[in-house]
Amino acid sequence: MKKFVGAHVSASGGVRNAPLNAQKIGAKAFALFTKNQRQWSAKALEEEEIEQFKANLKAAGIAPSCVLPHDSYLINLGHPGEAELAKSREAFLDEMRRCEQLGLDRLNFHPGSHLGAISESECLSRVAESINLALEATSGVIAVIENTAGQGSNVGYDFRHLGEIIDQVHDKSRVGICIDTCHMFSAGYDIRTREAYEASMAILDREVGWCYLKGMHLNDSKVKFQSRVDRHHSLGMGELGIAPFEFIMNDPRMDGIPLILETIDEALWAQEITLLYSLIKE
C-alpha cells in the first residue's frame, strides 16, 4: 500500500524552496502556490527558478505526481460576469502553464461561485467551459476540481456537481477531483464511522468515479456536520476525530496520490504526518 502524505508548504522566497520545506517535515507529497495566491498577476517563472525547483524536488525524493499545486483564491471559473470570468480564465491558464513549466502534472482549484446571479447548473457549465479552454491551450496538466463545503454561493459541495462538470469536459484524461475531508463533512457527507465512510465513498464513486481521484486534502473540521462552513482543524482535534483518517490510510483507493494536510497549526505537520503513517495496518 503506497500512501504519499504531506502538507501545503510555503513557497516564500521562490517555488524552489517548497520541496525543501516539504522534506523538513518528512513529507512524501506536498502542495504549494506557484505564485502569490492573493494577487492576480505575478512575474513569469525564471529558468533558474524552474531548474532549481526540479533539482530540489529530486533531492527531496518526491515524485512530480505527488505535488498538488493550488491555484489563486481570486479565481472564479464559474463567474456570472463576462469580464470577471475572462480575467479568471486568463489567470487560471497562467497557473496551468506554470505547472507545465515546473514539470507538474496537476493543478487543484475550487470550482467557483454563482454569486446569486446565475443558477448552479449555469455556473457548473461555465466552470466546465473554463476547463476546456485551459486544456486546449496547454498539455500534460490535469485540472483537479476540489469539492467545497458549500459556503456562500460556492458550487462543488454536492458530488453531483463534480460529475456534472466532468461530463462537460471534452478531454476526460485531463480532468480529476481532489476530495477535502473537512469540506465533505461540512457539506453533509459523513465519514466518522466505517459505515458512514463507505456510504459516502459509494456516493462519490456513483456521482463521479474513482478513476478521477487525483488527490485528497486531509483536514479535521472545527464545525459540526452539515454546517456548510469551511473551517479546518488539526487532526483529531475537531468534529471528525481520528477514525476517518485511519479509514483513508488503509483504503487502497487512496494509494499513489498526494494526501495533503491543510490543518491549521503548521508546527504540528511533522507530527501529523507521522501519526497518519502510524495508522496503517500491515
Swiss-Prot record:
Catalytic activity: Endonucleolytic cleavage to 5'-phosphooligonucleotide end-products
InterPro entries noted in UniProt: AP_endonuc_2 (IPR001719), AP_endonuc_F2_Zn_BS (IPR018246), Xyl_isomerase-like_sf (IPR036237), Xyl_isomerase-like_TIM-brl (IPR013022)
Keyword Phosphoprotein: no
Top-level taxon: Bacteria
Cofactor or coenzyme needed: Zn(2+)
Binding site for Zn(2+) 1: 70, 110, 146
Binding site residues for Zn(2+) 3: 183, 230, 232
Keywords of this entry: DNA damage, DNA repair, Endonuclease, Hydrolase, Metal-binding, Nuclease, Zinc
Protein's UniProt keywords contain Cell membrane: no
EC number(s) from the headed UniProt entry: 3.1.21.2
Cofactor remark: Binds 3 Zn(2+) ions.
GO molecular function: deoxyribonuclease IV (phage-T4-induced) activity; DNA binding; DNA-(apurinic or apyrimidinic site) endonuclease activity; phosphoric diester hydrolase activity; zinc ion binding
HAMAP family tied to this protein: Nfo
Known function: Endonuclease IV plays a role in DNA repair. It cleaves phosphodiester bonds at apurinic or apyrimidinic (AP) sites, generating a 3'-hydroxyl group and a 5'-terminal sugar phosphate.
Family of the protein in this entry: Belongs to the AP endonuclease 2 family.
Protein's recorded name: Probable endonuclease 4
Name of the gene: nfo
